[in-house]
A protein has these predicted regions:
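Long amphipathic N-terminal alpha/beta scaffold segment
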Residues: 49-95, 99-102
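A short linear hydrophobic-aromatic micro-motif
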Residues: 74-75, 142, 286, 422-427
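Conserved PLP-enzyme active-site core in the AAT-like
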Residues: 119-336, 451
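Structural motif of enzymes handling amino- and sulfur-group chemistry
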Residues: 305, 313-314, 321-372, 382-383, ...
Length: 457
């Protein structure tokens, strides 16, 4: 019986000659690959005890579905209903319309990436964002590379390579993906000198550690965790005094970084870049796609003498930004010239600054959209996270719409909405399926309502 079924399985060319597949607009390479995979799957089914082969038309439909799935990009848009503004797995910051348009224009056209129009000669790609960064942070000079880990790697390689870097034990963070500050320091060709204890580091610890091989003092903002209780750390002003007294630079990895003060939005403990430099930090680095709300980038700002050395290091070319990212970054930074415009235009700031009343009203509008499609729900107050390793101990008061799953379990509803062509990624909390409105665009309400109704129906 099994042998007869194997003989009856159609050949690859036979299936490719079927009208259902011949008229398809799918790429021939994908079709052939899908035919082979479907036939392999069919053979496995026969070995597993399949009693009869499917009709050829059904087989062709499976092949087309498989080929169409292969054409879907793995990187695609999702609806973020988690309430986590800087969700690392969902791409962190969403670009403003201005930034997205600037990136698209740079991608489509030739540009002045490294061309000096005024003098008709080669220019520098650093010039496109340097003046803006200096204006916004108070730095003497600035540059940008492709992420903050790269920025730290480049800074230490250029300013401390072959020497010793002093850092507090309480600041030796893991920044994600198993990338740890001690390992980055070692990769730069530096020796790490750890001072103090996990919970307490004193001025005298730094002073006692400085020696002939010391090249820099490193401060790391512990943005993705907090040490509380019996603690002590040395303020930036004192660290700068110690470093400068020995002719050394003070370097700070700010992590998320912030151009504007976020305390009015209820986010505390995130120092602004300007505050860091004003305290005496010589070189600071921070991310572009976190609290700044721009594209992925590592921004380096500080004293001109150090920034120029960093620009000339061989690693700088390997870590440089492309034209689309530079265009998006310039557009994002430009919005910060007017704080009100920045909060209104940059999605990250708009989400983080949304008041509880605004979010409640937004949740009511989503609830109505769901009700219009026959989906029952209730409003739930939530504690939203900033995300991206920022303000880890703080929750922002928000609102969510909890969908009644009907005949489905909460997990089944979550899976159905997550496996859509445009996934809806939400939260399950206390056996409720929550659509947290802080991170949902209003223009997605109708799609969410239709998808929920279809899933529950």
């Amino acid at each position: 019986m099994e042998e007869n079924l194997f003989r009856s399985i159609p050949r690859v060319d036979e299936l490719l000659g079927r009208d259902e597949l011949k008229v398809s607009a799918l790429p021939p390479m994908l079709l052939r690959e899908s035919v082979r995979e479907e036939l392999d799957a069919l053979r496995d089914e026969v070995r597993g005890g399949l009693s009869a082969l499917p009709e050829t038309g059904i087989l062709c439909a499976r092949i087309l579905a498989r080929a169409e799935e292969k054409q879907l990009p793995t990187l695609r848009s999702v609806i973020n209903a988690t309430g986590v503004t800087l969700h690392t797995n969902l791409g962190r910051a969403c670009l403003s319309e201005r930034a997205a348009n600037a990136a698209a224009e740079a991608a489509r056209d030739y540009s002045t990436l490294e061309y000096d129009v005024e003098n008709g000669c080669r220019g520098s790609r650093y010039q496109h964002v340097e003046a803006l960064l200096c204006r916004l942070t108070g730095a003497e000079a600035a540059m940008a590379v492709n992420n903050n880990a790269a920025a730290v790697l480049l800074i230490l390689s250029a300013l401390a390579g072959g020497g010793e870097v002093i850092a507090s034990r309480g600041e030796l963070v893991e920044i994600g993906g198993s990338f740890r500050i001690p390992e980055i320091v070692t990769q730069c060709g530096c020796t790490l000198c750890e001072v103090g204890a996990t919970n307490k580091t004193h001025r005298r610890d730094y002073e006692a550690a400085i020696g002939e091989q010391t090249r820099a003092l490193l401060k790391v903002h512990t943005s993705n965790y907090r040490i509380v209780g019996f603690t002590e750390s040395v303020p930036r002003e004192e660290l700068a005094e110690i470093a400068h007294g020995h002719g050394l630079p003070l370097i700070e990895d700010l992590g998320s970084g912030a151009i504007v003060d976020l305390e009015p939005f209820g986010i505390r403990g995130e120092p602004t870049v300007h505050r860091s430099l004003h305290a005496g930090v010589d070189v600071a680095s921070f991310s572009g796609d976190k609290l700044l709300g721009g594209p992925q980038a590592g921004l380096i700002v500080g004293k001109r003498e150090y920034i120029e050395r960093i620009k000339k290091h061989p690693l700088a070319r390997a870590l440089r930004l492309d034209k689309m990212t530079l265009a998006a970054l310039h557009a994002t930074l430009s919005a910060y010239l007017d704080a009100e415009i920045a909060v209104r235009e940059i999605p990250t700031l708009a989400m983080l600054s949304a008041s509880e009343d605004e979010l409640h009203a937004k949740a009511l509008r989503l609830q109505k959209a769901l009700a219009d499609t026959g989906v029952s729900s209730q409003l739930v107050r939530t504690g939203d996270a900033v995300g991206g390793g920022s303000a880890p101990a703080q929750k922002l008061t928000g609102w969510a719409v909890a969908i009644e799953p009907g005949r489905l379990s909460v997990d089944e509803l979550e899976e159905k909405l997550r496996l859509r062509a445009k996934p809806i990624v939400a939260r399950i909390h206390r056996r409720q399926y929550l659509l947290c409105v802080r991170t949902i665009r209003e223009e997605d309400f109708a799609e969410i309502a239709a998808a929920a109704a279809e899933a529950i129906r």
